[in-house]
Every structure is written in structure tokens, then in C-alpha cells.
């Protein structure tokens, strides 16, 4: 079931300048989530998801001309932020399934490919969790809490990545006079890679070609053969628009990575292994503070899995400052303490599926990081051999430690 928002509510725009709101209403797919407590149990929430602004059509007001070209913003329509906002209109998405997003109750499936007009189209959908109001993002404060979800990764071959992570995006998506669309239309994305998000940044025109930096907690980057989780601290709070060389020093793009295979547990995760990817998996991530309070300093990130009524612990040690001490820049950029500060302020859940045309996902599942061969991650190989690749996330819940799962 989908939640329809009137076009007059808000507009979306690719991470930069949000334009005016068009006439096509946004139709957010509902994704039921759960808030859990030690005493009260888990209570359902009427939340939904929204596609990133870059998936939306943004065009000249009163015309069909796109406000972007193959090389970025159309300079005749968007010479600056203010003019761009006045000239351009963002339209809603009515059919999320055509973008590879399908929902059913408390489950969401993301598809990499879809046959359109007789040809296979690559989709790579990325969606953000909206609060029950459908206007702002759901920002979770997870210090001394846990975040849990079920995942079916069985249809993700080598070279694919079905990800669920947290981003310190603004709750409103950067809503402003120049960005009336805001979170309702998927504006405001940022992560620790500080990549240039394209024509838009925080819902405004990205006329400077800035990168969008913010703290990122990768809860789950995985396919059926390999998995990692990793915190990525930054020296700044919230979205920071970087330029030039500073884009490589604001955040820890590498992060402190926990990869069971890389740590020597080669028979731990995969088809028919200890964590069996042929079956649905319950993934639990706990953010433990030094004093076991919601205001304490993040001291440890624990991971456990539940399958067929059994709890499966970490394959090796837990993630602590000591574990992360050898990471490239993790400690210098604030380490677990800085990551914990972002978790305390609140972070937005992000769901995505993608391939890797540049590195073929070797950093996740090959070259010592996993068992995949050197050519299995080639996107052309994946499309030819696994056209139905997809990931399903379900039963997303968060709350007090040990309150979100049972055995």
C-alpha cells in the first residue's frame, strides 16, 4: 500500500537546489517498521520510503525541458541557485515499481534490473526511510540501542551490494525557500565518501560541484558471498559541502571495516555456511556505550545473527577502539566516539542495491575480502547471468538492547 502526498506538500531535488513542486503527486511506498522496548515489546509504525531526488524528473516550469543535461545543470536554466529554483519544477513519482522498488507490509524489495521496452535497464534504486508524517526523514538515535532487520541476500551474486546503512542527513532534507521539496522528494543525501552528488546538493543547485559529506554507519554491505559492516566518522556534524582537496580529509571514507572472511573466518558466511545466505537472516547491530546509557560514549559495536531460532555471535572479536586502531584514518577523524556522537544526534536509514563498474566490488568480496573470482563482479557478467538479482529487507526494528529479537 502506498502513501500519496499532494503535490502541494513539498518538492524534491537532487542534492542541491530544490525547485518548485510540480503537478504530479509523490506516491511513497509504505514500509511498516517497529519501535521496540524491553517492557513494551515492539510497536508498529506507519513509515514509508522515498527515492533519492536524482530519480525524480526536474524540468523547466511550463515546459518539458529538463533542468539538467548529460554534463550537469543546464546553465541557461540554472546559472545560480536562486534562478534555478525559480525556473525548475520537480515532479513526484507515482509508480515506484518502475524504479525497482516493491513493497509489501513490512518488507521492501530492491531490484537491480528491469525489462523496459524489450531491453534490460539498470536501476540501482536508493531509498530513505521517512517518518510517519511522510514529510521528514526518520532520524534514529541509537546510542545504547540496537538496530535489527531481516534480509534475503540469496539473489545477490558476486559483484552486487544490497546495502542498509545510516546517514547523518538533515531530517527535513535541507528544506528551505530554495528547496521546498525537502525530504518528501528525497533531497539532502550525504555520506562519508564525500562524492559530488551531481546537479543537486541538499536540495539546491550544485553550481560549485561540491561533495556532500556526512557521517555514515554501514550496518550491512553484502551479497550472498561476503558481508561487512563499518563506521565512517567525520570531523563535521550533519551535511557539509566540501570542495577540492578537503573532500578527502573531512570523513573516513575507508572506515573501520569488519569482514569475517578477511579476519580468517572463511567458512562463516555464505551458502550453506554458519550464517547461511540461502535462507533469510536476522541481522542485529548493538551500539554499546561505556556507561550503558543513551548519553554515554560509544565503546563497542556488536554484531550477531539469528537463524532458525539460534543466535550466531561474531566470527571474531567485537568492534572496539582497539580493533579499529590499525584503520587508516579512523582514529584521527574521531573514531568510535565521533561516530557515537552522530548516532546520538540521529541518523537516517538508507536502503540500496548497486553494482560497481569501477572496482567490480572486489573490496567487498574478492582479493582477500571474499571468495569471489576476479571477473565475477563485472556488471556485464552479472546482467547476462543474474538478471533477476534483488535484495529484500523486512521487519526493520530498533530499540533497547536485546529487545528486537527472540529465540
Swiss-Prot record:
User: Which residues act catalytically here?
Assistant: 216, 221
**Keywords, ordered alphabetically:** Carbohydrate metabolism, Cellulose degradation, Glycoprotein, Glycosidase, Hydrolase, Polysaccharide degradation, Secreted, Signal
Q: What does this protein do?
A: Has endoglucanase activity on substrates containing beta-1,4 glycosidic bonds, like in carboxymethylcellulose (CMC), hydroxyethylcellulose (HEC) and beta-glucan. Involved in the degradation of complex natural cellulosic substrates.
**Coarse class of the protein's main subcellular location:** secreted
Q: GO biological process annotations for this chain's record?
A: cellulose catabolic process; glucan catabolic process
Residues with attached carbohydrate: 136
- Gene giving rise to this polypeptide: celB
CDD domains given in the database record: GH7_CBH_EG
Which cellular component appears as one GO term in the record? extracellular region
Q: Identify the taxonomic lineage of the organism of origin.
A: Eukaryota, Fungi, Dikarya, Ascomycota, Pezizomycotina
Signal sequence: where? 1-18
Provide the protein's localization.
Secreted
Question: InterPro entries from the xrefs?
Answer: ConA-like_dom_sf, Glyco_hydro_7, Glyco_hydro_7_sf
Q: Which domain of life is it from?
A: Eukaryota
Q: Which Pfam family, giving just one, matches this sequence?
A: Glyco_hydro_7
Q: Does the keyword tRNA processing apply?
A: no
EC number, UniProt record: 3.2.1.4
Q: What class of enzyme is it?
A: hydrolase
This one is known as Probable endo-beta-1,4-glucanase celB
Keyword DNA-binding appears in the UniProt entry:
no
Query: Which GO MF terms are attached to this record?
Result: cellulase activity
